[in-house]
């Protein structure tokens, strides 16, 4: 998990801190890891593949769409099936995870067939502090011109973008928005 922390810096370090605290306080208790990316393990190849050169994507840690918020999406699908007495073999559902992090998933026959999040939790919908989908050319432009370092870019993409970005959504209120 330490090695994966750069891919999900808002999620993995706090989870590792809890794991280590539990190990220290109660080393006798077994710990079980449940990864929310597992819900997306069967994404079709054409969905999980990025249109990049194979030598980049076929590494020890393959570059592909993993999807995130799988525990929430699975729970929503199960709840939908309970409420509507739906049979997983005939159900098509779109689920939305809306919180500090946001994602959309399409589920057919109880299996995820599409997700808005990809290799990292940065991809997809605009979130509280993450930009969501972003033209890679913007990042190249910033790096090539020396506007930001890789470290600064990583920090900005995870902590200072999205609804906290330059549009300043944080200053909007619903009544003001409704008033036009």
List where the protein language model places each region.
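Divalent-metal (Mg2+/Mn2+/Ca2+)-assisted nucleotide/phosphate chemistry catalytic cores
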Residues: 1-70
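Conserved small/polar residues in nucleotide/adenosyl-binding loops
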Residues: 170-176
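Adenine-nucleotide phosphate-binding core of ATP-dependent small-molecule kinases
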Residues: 155, 162-163, 172
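Beta-strand segments within the central parallel beta-sheet cores of soluble alpha/beta enzyme folds
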Residues: 92-96, 151-159
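Glycine-rich phosphate-binding loop of actin/hexokinase-like ATP-binding domains
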Residues: 42-145
